[in-house]
Amino acid sequence: ELIDALLLRHISIIGVDCAGVRRGAEHPPMDQHCADHDVFIVENLCHLGDVLQGRPFARCHVHTYPMNFTGMTGLPCRVAVD
């Protein structure tokens, strides 16, 4: 599975351009599985094509600025790339 392969690489963040890495009932357990490995999922990213600039992959620095709310399992955050 791709997610477990990424976790083995000791990444910090998984960014996706959709509502999650799993659908329905599988969504919360997978988010927790990643969080248990100190990896957080940033969902609903847009303009990823601008980062790739036509390339199949790109190296970049991604900065996340989560908003601090209590009592939530997911937090809105701002994302900036340089």
Show the residue positions of the predicted features.
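Active-/binding-site microenvironments in catalytic and ligand-binding cores
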Residues: 1-82
